[in-house]
Swiss-Prot record:
It is found in: Cytoplasm. Keywords: Cytoplasm, Hydrolase, Protease, Serine protease. This is ATP-dependent Clp protease proteolytic subunit 2. Belongs to the peptidase S14 family. It catalyses: Hydrolysis of proteins to small peptides in the presence of ATP and magnesium. alpha-casein is the usual test substrate. In the absence of ATP, only oligopeptides shorter than five residues are hydrolyzed (such as succinyl-Leu-Tyr-|-NHMec, and Leu-Tyr-Leu-|-Tyr-Trp, in which cleavage of the -Tyr-|-Leu- and -Tyr-|-Trp bonds also occurs). InterPro entries: ClpP, ClpP/crotonase-like_dom_sf, ClpP/TepA, ClpP_His_AS, ClpP_Ser_AS. It comes from Chlamydia caviae (strain ATCC VR-813 / DSM 19441 / 03DC25 / GPIC). Cleaves peptides in various proteins in a process that requires ATP hydrolysis. Has a chymotrypsin-like activity. Plays a major role in the degradation of misfolded proteins.
Length: 203
């Protein structure tokens, strides 16, 4: 079971305790710090939509430290990021692999960051296939469709050709922070919040 830290704030009317994620949300910070599952996606989407309703123009910061996860869950977050009217600053801390890398690249261009020792990885979708021969054919066709779909998204986000994305994704394709800049996944390596375009990363 994951332990969620609580922080205590002095509100002027006394002290108030809240979980750390709620406190970060006050600063328009959303954290993706685990495998990307449907429940996690629903939570992240709800946070993003809440922040949009609070202020549709102010930047949102999304910090990613994830090994990836379910494609449909990741695409739901991706579509929501694109749906928002405000800029979304993405940060890789630790790792952004698979769907995590796609979400990292989905941030507003010029505002996609990685910390110096971060690692990023892209690869083709995979899944266990069981059932009748007809079921197996359908699932295999769906995986191929998703492979092309994800390659198109990464191509749009990175500027790489679809063909190169597909070729590189045939195996786990790892990148360090500087390599991720060259690839187009991120725009800048930062070691301090002062290095970003958002001077209010943490208030």
């Amino acid at each position: 079971m994951t332990l969620v830290p609580y922080v205590v704030e002095d509100t002027g009317r006394g002290e108030r305790a809240m979980d750390i994620y709620s406190r970060l949300l006050k600063d328009r910070i959303v954290m993706i710090g685990q495998e990307i599952t449907e429940p996690l996606a629903n939570t992240v989407i709800a946070q993003l939509l809440f922040l949009m309703s609070e202020d549709p123009k102010k930047d949102i910061k999304v910090f990613i430290n994830s090994p990836g996860g379910y494609i449909t869950a990741g695409l739901a977050i991706y579509d929501t990021i694109r749906f928002l009217g405000c800029d979304v600053n993405t940060y890789c801390i630790g790792q952004a692999a698979s769907m995590g890398a796609l979400l990292l690249s989905a941030g507003t261009k010029g505002k996609r960051y990685a910390l110096p020792h971060s690692r990023m990885m892209i690869h083709q979708p995979s899944g266990g296939i069981i059932g009748t021969s007809a079921d197996i054919q359908l699932q295999a066709a769906e995986i191929l469709t998703l492979k092309k779909h994800l390659a198109n998204i990464l191509s749009e986000c990175t500027g790489q050709s679809v063909e190169k994305i597909i070729e590189d994704s045939e195996r786990d394709f790892f990148m360090g922070a500087e390599e991720a800049i060259s690839y187009g996944l991120i725009d800048k390596v930062v070691s301090s919040a002062k290095d970003t375009k958002d001077k209010d990363t943490i208030s």
